UniProtKB/Swiss-Prot annotation:
Pfam families: mit_SMPDase (PF14724)
Major place of residence: endoplasmic reticulum
InterPro entries (alphabetical): Sphingomy_SMPD4
Annotated GO CC locations: endoplasmic reticulum; endoplasmic reticulum membrane; Golgi membrane; nuclear envelope; sarcolemma
Regions that span the bilayer: 777-797
Enzyme class, first EC level, given as a word: hydrolase
Highest taxon, organism lineage: Eukaryota
Reactions listed under catalytic activity: a sphingomyelin + H2O = phosphocholine + an N-acylsphing-4-enine + H(+)
EC number(s) per entry: 3.1.4.12
Chain's role: Catalyzes the hydrolysis of membrane sphingomyelin to form phosphorylcholine and ceramide. It has a relevant role in the homeostasis of membrane sphingolipids, thereby influencing membrane integrity, and endoplasmic reticulum organization and function. May sensitize cells to DNA damage-induced apoptosis.
Membrane topology: Single-pass membrane protein
UniProt KW keywords: Cell membrane, Endoplasmic reticulum, Golgi apparatus, Hydrolase, Lipid metabolism, Magnesium, Membrane, Metal-binding, Nucleus, Transmembrane, Transmembrane helix
Organism from which the protein derives: Xenopus laevis
Organism phylogeny: Eukaryota, Metazoa, Chordata, Craniata, Vertebrata
Descriptive protein name: Sphingomyelin phosphodiesterase 4
Gene name linked to the record: smpd4
């Protein structure tokens, strides 16, 4: 390998490492990389850093897989799994390399073309993005060039590639699928969040491997956001002018600039995906003014302008997050809540933070609204509107429920949890969070109701999701907090003109321009209005969660839950033993064969009857929770349940779907479509043609079906007159022939509106298709085997079989004749 005593050229070092990737196993390659990082100076490591990043995380275009961290699991390859985690650990060799290069202020280019669509379109049209992460980093293309790049330091470059790794196509080992939480990538995300978002103490400073001292923070070009901007008394212009002196003036701020950078990168890469309309709506006047001031720092470069209405016309992105993507974002949300809730009690009050709070404590106070609130809301809106109506939506649901329950991530509890009721009581101190995140509780909840109305609630997984959402929102005090937040938002304004709100809406600034001006209305009301308008715009149409329209949605959902409960209960009451017995009896011809039946299987068959009973319980509890949230009248709810019960036939079977008669015939209503989709009702579809021409069934021999059909056709054609004469006789022989040679069922014309059963005389004919059934063949085989055991020859067995069939035919004829007077 390479020796530290020598000083090979960077190209030779890079070439040697590339050669080792082909010839050496993974463990030895990582050990060699650790020695190289420890032994060689930053000048020589600078040349191999981009190659090493690409080797670990893969290329941005996906042509190089890298270490496939998302597909690396302990159960598949434990040696590589633990080696990769140790190498990429926050205190591991890779981070030592990052800090060593950062100390020398090396820069690395990251193509703008791989950034999320809104940011990419903004930069390509020379519009400065709002996020400070991109300020002073944009490299404009040379004359004639079209590609933009970001000049990043080693830490930023590493985090950009690490975050972008989540957006690439996942590569699983052939035929193997494991939980996302067990992958090396997911575990590393968890490690980085725990390391850079410490609950106790400060962020561990990076240590230089050569001198033992700490690595200095970046020069004034650093992307770190000035912490004075978090205060409510800092103006926009001061924010950027004072930034150049902050890095060296405030040692405490140097400790957490990596935390800021990590959060900004994760949020920008994972959540910054939305439509052009949403992007333009987010460009508030304050954001445009901020971008205008930032032009001062890039005055030597080609002009870059703030976003204007109608700009970014070329932006178009179709983004569909994966379930793994959502699970990782949920992990980020949980860590941010834990980090924010770890603030010292004396720093919770905004009146004291500006004088006594450290930068880390100040970051904890504002990390959720400043970094993630807006983009997570848009991300959730996108998922609620575009995610398929299947069970995979559970990941999105849990991410949403994690965000709206920050009280679940409080480390210190005043007393241990003694029961469910104590867990379900939301402390009053969280009312501020509910008010400042009102749309997460109201609009997203109503969108979830709309999704639930379009799903199959009999499905156990869908029923569980409705139960989970209802249980969370029925927690004690939470509905009252949401109602109070709505009342604050709807509180009439008597002094502030409507158009002045836009100065208070920018989520990046927190309304700092007008912080010294005390409006006549309450601060709480102002915060709620600012939150809603910042996310939805001035022209938003707000639907009250406890208004009449939302209440109608809940009543519709309650009715559908009652219908689904009825269906689940009828399925759970259907004993598997009775089905088995019926199938067993049908082998002996004692069952009722259904030639017109269709396949009734569904996910419920695979789930099992215990799961179906659990589904019934989930729906029952969900209905109770909705009653608690919206205070539904028990009488009204009982009437809904009674209507559902009355819609069932006495024999437990569903009626026809709801239809209306139109000029074009029968048309399904929306309720009828829902009934069919959810299996609540169905049309009685019967085969009206020649039974001999039905499709070959799985229990029939295809060759015999075809042969017997040709044989019966020849017999019916040749002896048609004879069979007709026999059926015309008035004696018992005529009755016998009519019963077995003519169709016993009449063709029926059915519709949801009318039922007409015209009789159509059928010509006498014989049917031999029953002989092609495997069941019949098995009976014949068993019969002849028993005959041979009783020393009966084939001729005698055949004669006895014919005698038995004749006796059976006579008995059937006699029974049918006895039933005719009763039927008439």
């Amino acid at each position: 390998m390479l020796l530290a005593g020598g000083s090979p050229q960077p190209s030779f070092l890079l070439g040697s490492l590339k050669a080792d990737c082909v010839t050496k196993p993974f463990l030895q390659r990582c050990q060699d990389l650790v020695r190289v990082i420890e032994d060689f100076p930053a000048k020589e490591l600078h040349a191999i850093f981009p190659w090493l990043i690409e080797t670990v995380f893969g290329s941005l275009d996906g042509s190089i897989l890298g270490w496939n961290l998302r597909g690396l699991h302990e159960r598949i390859n434990p040696l590589e799994f633990h080696t990769a985690l140790e190498f990429l650990d926050p205190s591991g060799a890779m981070m030592k390399l990052v800090y060593k290069l950062q100390a020398e202020e090396y820069k690395y280019d990251f193509p703008v073309s791989f950034l999320p669509g809104p940011v990419r379109a903004s930069i390509q049209e020379r519009v400065l993005p709002e996020c400070p992460l991109y300020h002073n980093k944009i490299q404009f293309p040379a004359s004639g060039g079209v590609s933009f790049n970001l000049a990043l330091n080693s830490f930023e470059y590493f985090m950009f590639h690490f975050a972008f790794c989540l957006l690439k196509q996942r590569n699983y080992p052939q035929g193997l699928h494991f939980s996302t939480a067990d992958s090396a990538y997911y575990i590393l995300v968890d490690k980085y969040l725990k390391w850079f978002l410490p609950v106790e103490g400060n962020v561990p400073p990076p240590h230089s491997p050569n001198t033992g001292g700490t690595v200095p923070s970046p020069a004034p070009r650093s992307p770190s956001l000035s912490f004075t901007s978090y205060g409510s008394h800092t103006s926009l212009l001061k924010r950027h002018i004072s930034h150049q002196h902050l890095v060296n003036a405030d040692p405490a701020a140097q400790e957490i600039w990596r935390t800021e950078t990590l959060l900004q990168v994760f949020v920008e890469i994972w959540l910054h995906h939305y439509s052009l309309e949403m992007y333009q709506k987010m460009q508030s006047p304050n954001a445009k003014l901020e971008a205008l001031h930032n032009r001062l720092s890039v005055s030597s470069a080609p002009p870059i302008y703030p976003a204007l209405p109608g700009s970014l016309h070329s932006y178009q992105e179709l983004f569909q997050p994966t379930e793994e993507h959502v699970l990782v974002v949920r992990l980020l949300v949980k860590h941010l809540h834990t980090f924010s809730n770890s603030i010292r009690p004396e720093q919770v009050s905004p009146s004291t933070h500006s004088h006594t709070a450290s930068p880390l404590e100040e970051l904890k106070r504002v990390v959720v609204p400043r970094f993630i609130q807006q983009k997570l809301y848009i991300f959730l809106q996108h998922c609620f509107g575009h995610w398929p109506l299947d069970a995979s939506f559970r990941a999105v649901l849990e991410m949403w429920l994690s965000y709206v329950q920050p009280w679940r991530y409080v480390l210190e509890r005043s007393s241990p949890v003694s029961g469910e009721m104590q867990n379900r009581n939301v402390p009053e101190k969280w009312s501020t969070f509910v008010q400042e995140n009102l749309l997460f509780y109201t609009k997203l909840f109503l969108r979830f109701l709309s999704r639930a109305l379009r799903t199959d609630l009999v499905n156990p997984k869908n029923a569980l999701m409705v139960f989970r959402a209802a249980k969370v929102f029925s927690q004690l005090n939470l509905p009252e907090m949401i109602l109070n937040g709505e009342q604050l938002f709807l509180k009439p304004e008597h002094v502030i003109p409507h158009r002045q709100h836009r100065l208070l809406l920018t989520p990046n600034l927190g309304g700092s321009f007008l912080s010294s001006w005390q409006p006549p209305i309450t601060d709480t009301s102002l915060k709620v209005k600012s939150h809603v308008f910042s996310l939805e715009g001035q022209d938003c149409q707000y639907m009250q969660m406890f208004g009449p329209e939302a209440r109608n949605l809940v009543l519709r959902l309650a009715q559908m839950i009652s219908q689904a409960k009825q269906t689940a209960k009828s399925i759970s009451n259907h004993s598997p033993d009775s089905s088995a017995n019926q199938s067993f009896l049908s082998w002996f011809g004692l069952g009722s064969p259904d030639f017109n039946g269709s396949y009734n299987g569904s996910d419920l068959d695979e789930a099992g009857y215990d799961t179906i009973r659990k589904t019934d319980e989930h729906l029952e509890k969900a209905l109770d929770y909705f009653c608690q949230i919206f205070r539904l009248n028990p009488t009204q709810l009982g009437q809904l349940t009674a209507n559902v019960d009355s819609s069932q036939d006495d024999d437990g079977k569903n009626k026809l779907p709801d239809c209306i008669q139109s000029e074009d015939g029968v048309v399904l209503t929306s309720l009828g479509r829902y009934q069919i989709i959810n299996g609540l009702r169905k049309f009685d579809i019967e085969y009206q043609g020649d039974p001999e021409l039905q499709p070959i069934r799985s229990y029939e021999n295809a060759m015999l079906v075809r042969y017997l059909y040709r044989l019966s056709s020849v017999i019916n054609k040749r002896f048609a007159n004879s069979m007709g004469a026999l059926c015309a006789r008035k004696d018992f022989l005529g009755k016998l022939c009519r019963h077995h040679l003519t169709s016993s069922s009449r063709k029926c014309k059915k519709s949801p509106i009318t039922s007409v059963s015209p009789s159509e005389p059928a010509a006498p004919h014989i049917r031999l298709r029953f002989l092609a059934s495997y069941r019949t063949l098995a009976f014949l085989f068993i019969f002849y085997i028993l005959g041979s055991l009783l020393s009966l020859g084939p001729l005698i067995c055949t004669f006895l079989l014919l005698i038995g069939c004749m006796f059976y035919a006579i008995v059937q004829t006699l029974l049918s004749e006895e039933q005719k007077p009763h039927n008439n």
